[in-house]
Amino acid sequence: MAEEKKLGLPSVIATGVGLIVATSCLLSIGQGASILGTPFIITMAIACAFNILTALSICELNALMPNLTGGLAQFTLASCGPFITIITNMGGFICCQLILGSSEAAMFGNTLCEVLPSIPVTPAMWSIGLVIILFVLNLFGVDMFAKIQNIVAYGLIGSLVVLGILGCIKINPAAVVDQPSVLIHNYSETFSLLGLAFFLFIGVEFIVPISPNVKNSRKIVPWGMVLSLVIILVMQILMVLGFKNITSWEELGKSTVPHILYGSLLLGKAGTIWMSVVSMLAVISTLNTSIFGVSQLCAGMAKIGLLPAFFLKKTPAGSPYFGMILVAAVISIINATGLSSSDSLVFLIMTGCTFWIFCYIMVHVDVIMLRFKLPKAPRTFKLPFGILIPILGVIGNAFMICNIDPDMKNKMTIYGIFGGVSVVLAVYAFFWCKLKIKRPLFKPYAIKEVMAMDTDLYQIRHYPNLAKKLHLEAQPDVTPLSADTNTGTRPEE
């Protein structure tokens, strides 16, 4: 049988770039540039550097425990125990994806209202309608949008690069505006928007699941992660420079769809249509990924005993529908409250980012804890300089949380939401650990147990009632050979 073709560095980079970029990132670029001007490039570069440190830590964790389906939850389970794992992953990924998915849906509604102003439909109605359609479609299977997902994402990226370059070279002299490049008095103010810039680079960890299909993954996966982030940074720098030449900072700050504003000013109606079509397809693709991805994450955490078993229930097509119901309901409720202004959208994004940054802090903590716990365990990829990189990562991510929003009132509100949700999750985690799984709160699981959790045998042994409901059976993977098969223990005749 022919050997399965392995992925190379270009495929890994393409996957990483396609997964990280979303249309709500464009709002963040526009908001950051309208506040700082071109110095926002410095802010983006700092945030990119911190995210590169996180990517490298994720690579070491994946090298120690490869091919896990529970996401970063299983790494934390092996380093800090179930209590911290539940809080981190439910807050850092599930809650965050619900919040950021809501902002993507809102961008879809705002885009349609911008390009179709004559239709008397509110942005919330467009957004909720899209969520309902994607929810129904996802119930029918995993690969509903798989064939166009990457094409759409790469189309958005290519469009932004081209538009950024056209703006930089001032291809339309009539559209050029005369305005200052720098809007701040002190370059220390660039730190004030680190939280906003962080959002532009999240999601690089989603490269990890494809690592088994990558040739020489020990070297290519880390390089792919780093280069994905650098390529995105270059694309965003081009957009900021284009904004400076074409769009007034004031208009940019007010717009909820800055990419469409920029496209229309640069290329007229053609630019509006171009960016509208590409961005709406990208929103659909990203939101579809969010709906299915969160449901899969919930199912993965349920499989390792950290969430109720009903998250494992699937439709005949194999879709975990309880998680999908949760995602669709929460996103619809958030959008029903109204997300028409750029300020409310940015606030929503910053709130979600706080949870995600906290989860990234735990990634670095996991590396440090496992370095001390298992110093001699084999790792196909190991960070240089001991624990220096994860320590810098913890400091950098904590610094971004401290600078999550330049407005102190908004910052305190975000902290309040983060703290309130964390308390609720802590109460759930305490009772779940004590009453349901009956495990010590802070005692790490053995790595061999964490890696065994993905197998049906583990579920049958530890959760027999659940295994019975899921119709799991322990079947041998090896097919008996016929008596005349030569296994290499005797010479050929």
Pin down the residues of each PLM region.
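Hydrophobic transmembrane alpha-helices that form the core helical bundles
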Residues: Q31-S34, T43, I52-V131, F135-L139, ...
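TM-loop-TM module centered on a large, flexible mid-protein loop between adjacent transmembrane helices
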Residues: A73-G81, C113-S118, V226-I291, L307-C353
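Helix-loop-helix junctions that connect adjacent transmembrane segments
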Residues: A2-E4, I41, L116-M125, N150-S276
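Transmembrane helix-loop junctions in multi-pass membrane proteins
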Residues: C25-I29, E104-A105, L137-D143, A270-G271, ...
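The first (N-terminal) embedded transmembrane alpha-helix
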Residues: L9-L27, V330-I333, I395-N397
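Terminal cytosolic tails of multi-pass membrane transporters
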Residues: M1-K6, H364-G386, N410-E493
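Membrane-interface loop-to-helix entry segments
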Residues: G109, P123-P173, I184-N186, G224-V230, ...
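C-terminal membrane-solvent junction of multi-pass transporters and transport-like membrane proteins
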Residues: F310-A317, I357-K409
